[in-house]
A protein has these predicted regions:
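Positively charged n-region of N-terminal signal peptides that target proteins for export
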Residues: 1-4
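Bacterial N-terminal signal peptides
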Residues: 7-17
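Cleavable N-terminal signal peptides
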Residues: 11, 22-23
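Structural detector for internal amphipathic alpha-helices that build alpha-solenoid repeat scaffolds
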Residues: 23-27, 45-58, 65-69, 76-91
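Amphipathic alpha-helical scaffolding segments comprising HEAT/armadillo-like alpha-solenoid repeats
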Residues: 26-38, 59-70, 92-107
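HEAT-repeat alpha-solenoid elements in large eukaryotic scaffold proteins
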Residues: 40-44
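Mid-to-C-terminal functional-domain signal that highlights helix-capping/loop sites
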Residues: 67, 90-467
Length: 467
């Protein structure tokens, strides 16, 4: 008797399961498309009906569009979207990557990112473009071409809170002599750049507001791409594949990293890797060349390079260029502002590192562990390197070939020197280490970043530790 009852119960459960699957199967592509259209619209009754059908459907294809909607103000309709996501299981076990605790959007976004094969509705890319055009900026729709190749999951592209070019790039900005830069204090931090014998300083108090400078330095077109969220300023050559590119801010993020776009094709590029990831050039194989850049104090840069030019505060934009004005609280907090689901847990997300990629190998050096001042010898991708850290904490990396350098930096005649074990001195330059008889060891293109940003795109990164 008990066996018969158990058989009946099992059959009932199986029937319920099959019934749920059948119910899910009843949401045809046409009905789904109609609901997604209603979710884009302004007709409240249709919006609510679509949410209700999503809630009862058990169809996972509703999840990604509902998550997109949660990113925007919905008023009292937010409860209906959250209820639908809950019924679809997208609020079970989501962590939000340690940010926005208790916020449904973060939880659901983390849940979706954890799915090995997320189910997306037909036409999702075009739908997302229409949503962003309606809710943020009509110009954003052109980024979401359904025919374009994408090297990243489109459902994980996030809105960064601004319109396209809402963070305006600086194009060949006005420069002034160091002596005329009275608006800067000695401790203000700057990106120091030297290309073709010409030096330039880009104060962070200005770049915090613009995040991109398209410029010409030493007759070379360059773009200084700065992601404030991941703490990384990367200097790129503007030349790639025989073309010259200039860049702007798309207003979009991936892994809490700025997606910049080129103005020539409207392709989205990864700011940290210099690669096109979504759009006309995503399949091109292009990659921007990294160039050396250093973050140091204005006093140190001006002392080492009295001939330097520096950005004028007359940028043409009405901004408060007080240091730390737009992101000071974020820089001081250990919290992230947006999800970075691919970040490595080896270190806290906002640990600052100096990062290098050589011979196909990525390596990160936690700033707090580096000598200040001092030098370390190491290998990256089988290439011998030496990192020199000055008294401001500025880090420069050079090839060292078969030479062995001591751990001490010395000051003499207004310059900084490293010494080989045999006592021969090498002067730190922006392009190279310069040794006896004019010998040169090339500077390498490393830069700073928060650990979460770097490890999201270089998950196999080796981490240097103190001997």
């Amino acid at each position: 008797m008990r066996r018969a009852v158990l058989t009946v119960l099992c059959a009932g459960i199986a029937a319920l399961s099959l019934g749920a699957e059948a119910a899910a199967a009843k949401v045809s592509d046409a009905k789904l498309a109609a609901d997604l259209k209603a979710l884009l619209g302004t007709e409240v009754r249709a919006f609510r009906a679509a949410c209700k059908r999503a809630e009862s459907s058990r169809d996972p294809r509703y999840v990604a569009p509902l998550i997109e909607l949660l990113r925007f103000p919905l008023g009292e309709e937010k409860e209906r979207v959250v209820a639908a996501l809950g019924a679809l299981g997208a609020l079970d076990g989501g962590t939000g990557a340690g940010i926005g605790r208790g916020e449904p959007w973060h939880e659901a976004f983390a849940w979706l990112g954890a799915q090995k094969d997320p189910k997306l509705p037909p036409g999702f890319v075009d739908w997302k473009g229409r949503l962003f055009a309606a809710r943020v900026d009509p110009a954003m729709r052109r980024f979401f071409d359904p025919e374009a190749k994408s090297r990243i999951p489109v459902e994980r592209i996030q809105w960064g809170g601004v319109k396209k070019d809402g963070i305006p790039a600086l194009d060949k900005p006005e420069r002034i002599a160091a002596a005329d830069a009275s608006y800067l204090t000695p401790e203000d931090r700057v990106f120091g750049v030297s290309v073709g014998g010409e030096t330039r300083a880009y104060p962070l108090r200005i770049l915090d507001w613009h995040e991109m400078a398209n410029d010409v330095v030493g007759d070379t077109s360059v773009s200084l791409a700065y992601c404030t969220l991941c703490g990384a300023g990367v200097l790129y050559s503007g030349q790639a594949g025989g073309r010259t590119f200039t860049f702007g801010s798309s207003g979009l993020l991936y892994e809490s990293n700025k997606l910049m776009y080129d103005r020539q094709t409207l392709t989205l590029w990864n700011q940290l890797t210099g690669e096109p990831v979504f759009g006309p050039l995503a399949a091109s194989g292009l990659k921007l060349e990294r160039l050396p850049v250093v973050v140091t104090t204005w006093a140190k840069w001006k002392k080492d390079h009295p001939e330097t030019r520096v950005l004028s505060p007359r940028t043409g934009f009405d901004r408060d260029y007080t240091p730390g004005k737009p992101y000071g609280a974020y820089f001081e907090s250990p919290e992230l502002m947006f999800p970075a689901l691919g970040a490595s847990p080896k270190m806290a997300g906002k640990v600052q590192v100096f990062a290098l990629v050589l011979g196909g190998v990525a390596k990160a050096y936690p700033l707090a562990d580096l000598p200040k001042p001092g030098a370390i010898s190491d290998q990256v991708g089988g290439i011998p390197v030496v990192l020199a850290v000055d008294e401001t904490g500025a880090v420069r990396a050079y090839e060292r070939k078969d030479r062995e350098f001591g751990p001490v930096l010395r000051q003499a005649l207004g310059a900084t020197f490293l010494a080989e074990g045999n006592g021969r001195a090498w002067r730190l330059g922006e392009d190279a280490l310069i040794g006896p008889e004019g010998r040169r060891l090339a500077r390498l293109p490393g830069h700073l970043a928060y650990w979460f940003g770097w490890s999201s795109f270089y998950p196999a990164t080796e981490v240097w530790s103190k001997p």
